[in-house]
Structure formats: structure tokens, C-alpha cells
Amino acid sequence: MRWREVTAVAALVAVAATAVVLVPAGGGGAAPPRRDIGAEAWSGLVGSPRAPVATGQRVLVVLSSFSLADRVARAGGLASDADERGWTAAALAAQGQFIGNLAREGIAIRPEFRFTRTLNAFSATLDASAIAALERRSGVKGVYPVRVAYPATVRTTARGAFGPGIRLAGISGRGVTIALLDTGVDLRKPYLHGHVLDGIDVVGDSADARAHAKPTDPAQLERHGTEMAGLMVGSGPVTGGVAPGATILPIRVAGWQADQRGDYAVYARTDQLLAGLERAVDPNGDGDAHDAARIALVPLVEPFAAFSDSPLARAVEGAQRLDTLTVAAAGNDGPAGPAFGSVGGPAGSPAALAVGAVDARPATTDVRLVVRAGLSVLLDRLVPLAGATPPQRTLLLRPAALRTPVSSAQSFFDHGSSLVAGRAAVVAGGADPAETARWASLAGASAVLLHGRQVAPGAIGLDERIGIPVLSVPDATARALLRRPTALVAIAAPRTKAMRNAIAPFSSWGLAFDGGVKPELLAPGVGLGTTEPGRAADGKQAFGAVSGSSTAAAVVAGAAALLAEARPDADARTLRALLVGGSDRIGREPVAAQGTGLLDLGRAASAELVADPPILTFGRGGGDGWQGRRTIRLRNVSTRRLTVFVSTGQRRNAHVPVSLSARRLQIEPGAVAELGVKARLVTFVRAEAAMGTLTLTPIGGARVRIPWAVVLRSPANLVGTLALSRHVFKPSQQQPAIVVVRAGRVVRSSHGNEVIPVLRMDVELADAKGKRIGLLARIRDVLPGRYAFGLTGRGPGGRVLARGRYTLRVLAWPTGGGVPTMRSIDFKIR
């Protein structure tokens, strides 16, 4: 995972900060803002070098009115077709009335997407006055930023592909529909024929969800959706799909769209993802969700945004109420924690089945890498080979470290001369490590040392176009090579070692921002074969292979389809519980890295006991003496009486002991028993979080594992820098004073880095005596970064402030509850 401060435009967040201080209330609501008003910028502290994308001033407005999912839940899950169509129409009408009332008050809103099935909300491009009015208005749960989601795959091509080995005897997923929320699918692929419907295009206006070509390069077709479809239902001769009898409903929510560089990149906006989830639960769009897909796969990730209250998280919960299980990729940003991790959205939703990646290949290749600078040894260790070609003999190379980000093959050249020829190219892996390594190879490098992103062993070894060794090195080693260009890099001949299931080094860790365990489980996600045909180096036919948490999520989505056929009475909530509860722990990695462990479909299919919820989230614990209580409903889905023994697996000296209402339960067939679980903090601990696993073992049956977690500390100092460009100024909309706020934190830890976000940030105005005048702005679900906005000298109501002294206060609330951090700064209006 790459952690650095980047410069990126996120006008939405800035506008949320500037909204009420730039333009008086009552203006024309949806007109584009003037770009000369003031600073509008966001600079994040976390993230991989993905394509920079501006979302404009798009926001998601979540309303308090009932959605279809709310109505169905209130009816106990029982509703007729006519009921559901009526409720959807009522939700749309209530939304229309709300927008109409705003228009009559002079705030015109033109929604881009309207959501009524999974939640009641709409997205729109809003100006400052509209955001101000909505934040203050009853009937609005909140105004949230529209963010960007990217395919969670490390791209690879032909060589060494293998299958995940997930099967159920006599079960193929027949009769089960999987909604694939991704790029378009290449419907011409022969090994997908008969398994993929025409689908729905959310991004464009096509009649189906076919894969689109890059507007500036027709040869570059969207591939990610095709690869995911192949993993689930493909019928290739080398590696078949997990659920070959299932049907894919492709919903194109991502694709080639304009980026900030003036080029095109493949991505989705979160409002497009929401629109796709709306169609997943109501494919024909008639307002009745009885035709909902059983499974919705989201192999895209909104980086680091593991918020439990976001519109996307709410929509995933709504989809579950409508009986659609959402399977989501955890992310490819590597280890993090020990409390909050690197999991993205929508995987952070409490109702999503978040999936991490495991490397399940039988063997990998290691090489010894030694880096020397004079008499100093900077690195001496066995390193997994990531590239296609192992060295045939020991290579002695000088490093060539690139100081600037790599964006194309030209990055390796200076005025036509290669910067890396005959050397070991030291370069950031970027969003696509395989492509970066290929560019270095074309520039004549003899080896590639990738940093800033952990690459799974052999993960790009499937790319035959890379004819040199590719290794992943620590950031510290890369920085040392930047300082010492005369160092010597030695790469020894390889040796092959047998593999056991190991968590892929790129797979994101939790916890989510509500303290929930994420990912819930792991699945094979490295080097899996797809239906992408190609040619190997010897000219023989080969098939593409992909790696990433999206790959693992596709495997689990296929497994869920098999389970849905095998257990047709299981609803979405039960499917999730069966898959999570039956997994197998691997290695010694913490619960936050693997949840319950590696997918075991056979155990899930034969389970006699279902635990709801399958994950226990205690949230944030208080001080000494804190106690948290949760209840687990245990349902006997077998035909026999079950005697169940419950174990906490804890030692006696645990700092956060977990106690149970019963250690032994007897449950009749079809009956439900409740198990009380209490966690308490008995002494001060330095740890950021505590976690563990409950084990429920029926006599003569398969055990069920339930992970739990408690976040032990409330983060402090959520507001860092608070600066004002001018402390004395006249009111001006054209030349405002610039306020810069640094919100949230990124803390280095032994696990990697911990992302500490802000649930809500308020900007308030007070007079010279400290009396609160009112709220100027509110930003929700704030990721760590710098937020800049203009202070025009107008108050909360839009009126020009009188001459005098004022105080600007910034309050930032932590996720999971707690006391806000407050910083203030004084200024004077003259």
C-alpha cells in the first residue's frame, strides 16, 4: 500500500466546506459554481497512485423518507408485487415533492440519479446555496460526497493460470442470477455464451452492458467485467467458472470516463454504483423487487472509505432487505491497522460480505536480493519473484531510481535516452504494477524493483511480455537507493518453494470504521484463470489470469450462487452467515486480516447451525470498566436436536475478557436460541483494538466461528493544521480569505498504517465573545487530508458580516462516537 500526500482536486468536498460562506442562501440551486470564487482543493494523505478523477460538485442527498427496502422490512419481508410497485412509486413521489418544495423556495435541483429501492436518495451537482439549505433542512439525513471506485485487480496476462478449486457435487448455480456491477462485458467471448444476459448500461446510453473501447484508442477494450464473468460462469477448456450454471446480469457502472489529466481511465463514481445496485434489486425497473438478483458482485473499491453510514453502505443494507447479497472486494491496499485498516467501500458496509485474497498456488519462486552501498548492507533477504522471468545466474546491477511518478513508457526516457538501460529500475508499482514493469522492460532495464505497493509472488509473472526479473522491495530500501545511486544490487539464481495458503500481500486489512471485522473471509485471489484467450511465448493457446481482491470476491460470488442453489430457502442474510461461519482460519494473521479465514464451501453447504449476526461488532469501548453487550441468534437448520458448545478461546489474563450467557445450548430442529455475549475492559491497555473469535461446536456437526472486535481508544487530534491566509479582510466573493484545515490522521504502526477518518466535520462561526452565530458548513465521512475553502465574510444566512472580530471553529467527530476535536482561529472583518 502506498501512503503519501498527494495533490488532487475534489471539488465536492471543498464545496461542502465553502458552500455557505461563498454564496448567500436562496440562489439558483443547480448552476455550476464560479471557479474564481476561492480555493477548492483536497489533498489526501492516503492512497495508491490511481488515475486522478474529479467528481465535480456531485453530492448524494440521503432523505428520511422510506425506501422500498424500508417498507418491505416493516412488512416483515412479505409483500405482493403490487405492494412493492406502490411503495416504490410512493418513495419516488415523496422525493419529487421534496425537490419541488425546494424549487418553490428558489433552490432548483436537477437530480442525475434518483434512488428509491435500496435507499431514498438522489445525486446531483449542487451549488453552495443548495448544499447549505439541504444541510439545515428537516427530512434530510445528510449530504455526502460522491467519490470514485476503481477495479480491484492487479492485471495479468497469459501463463500459469489455475482454478480456485471451488465446487459442490451436482450443483452448478443453475437458476441463480448474479448481478455483476463492473465494466461492460465482452459478449463475443465464446466461453461466456449462454451465461451472460444483455445487461444494463448505467455509465452510458447503450442498450446493453457490452464492453466499451477507450475513446482515444479503440484497441483498448474494457476487460475487468469480462474477467470477473469468466471467473464465475466461464466454460473455458483450461479453467472453468465456479458456478457455470448461473446467469450473469452485467450492469455497467464503470468504464472509460474522462480523468483530470485530459485522458480516459476506467472507474465508477459512487452514485453510478448506487444506480447499479438499484437495478440489481429491480432488473426490469418496474418497482417490484421480486425479480432481484440473488447475488450482487461489486469488484470495485472506493479506496479506504470503509464508512458504515455512507449512502453506499446504506444501499448494501437495503439490498439485503430485498434479499440480494452484496459480495464486495476488500481492496488491494495491503496490511494496515491495528484498529482501522485499509478496507474500501462498499466492503466496509456492515451488510456487505467483504472478501480478501489468499495466494493458493502450489508453489512460488524466491530469489536472494542483496543491496549494498559501500561497506553497508541495505538489504539481504529472500524475496518472492513477482515477474515472469527468473535470473539464470546472479545479476550484479547498478540501480536507476526514478524520482517522479510513472505514467507511461516515456517516463523511463529523457530526451530519447533510457534512464534504466542495463540497470535495476527502482520504481513505484503504481495502480498497475505489471504495466509499470513492462514499460521498464521495454526501456532496457535488466531487472525491476517495485516499491510502494506489495505485489504477490508471481502475481505479474503471468505476463509474458516482461522478460526480466521483477521484485517487490520495501519503501525504505527504495528511498536508500534514491540517495545512493552508486549502490550495487545483487539478484541470485532462484529457488522454488512449496506454498501453503497465505494472505496475499496486497489484500486489504480491516477493521472498518465502525469497528467491524473486515474482510469477513478470504478466497483464492492470485493467478486465477479467466476466459481471456491469448498466446503464450511458444505460440500455444493460453488463457489470461488475474489477481486481486476482486478476483477473490468473484470466486465467493460464484460460491454463493452454488450455495443458493443447494439451499434454496436461504435468504441473503443466511447465505452470508453460512459462508462466513464455515470458513477455516489460516496462519497466525490477526482477525482483522482474514475474518473467519479461507472459504470452505462444503462446510457452508452442510452447516446445521446459522449464527446471526456472523460478526460481532462492539464498536468503540470506553474507559476502564467499559462493558459492551451483544446477542447472537442461533438457528438450527437441521432435522435433529443440536447440542452446541461455545468457547471464547481466551486466556484468563485477557485485557478484554468475553463472557457468555451459556456455554452449552440445546436447540430443537427449526428453533432459535439466543446467546448473550459481553465484552468488558478490565484494565488499561496500550493496544488500539482487541479482537478474537467465538467457536460454536455442535456435537456431531461442523463448527461455526464468529469473530469479534472492540476499538479501545478514541482518536485525538482529528484537526491538525488550521490556517487562514488573511486575518483581516473585507467581505468579497471574488477574493475570499483561504482557510486550510487538515482533518483526520494517518498513523504508522507495526501492521502498516492506520487510517483515522472523521465522521463529521463542522465549521462554525462565533462572535468576539465566543457566542455561537451558526453553522457555516458540514462535511461527512471525511478521509484524512487537507481541505481548503474560501471565507467570503458572509454569515450562515448569507448576509454580509458586520465589521468586527469573529472566531472560526472547526469541530471533528470520530467514527464510532466520542468527543470531538475542536480548533479555532480568529479573524477580523473591516
Language-model region placement:
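Inhibitory N-terminal propeptides of secreted protease zymogens
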Residues: 32-152
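N-terminal domain-start motif of subtilase-like serine proteases
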Residues: 33-53, 111-114, 123-135, 151-180, ...
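Catalytic-core environment of secreted peptidases
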Residues: 197-199, 203-211, 219, 429-430, ...
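Substrate-binding/access-modulating region of protease and related hydrolase catalytic domains
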Residues: 235, 253-480, 513-516, 536-553
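Subtilisin-like serine protease catalytic core
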Residues: 54, 71-73, 136, 166-200, ...
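Surface-exposed binding patches on compact interaction domains or structured appendages
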Residues: 588-591, 602-616, 638-678, 720, ...
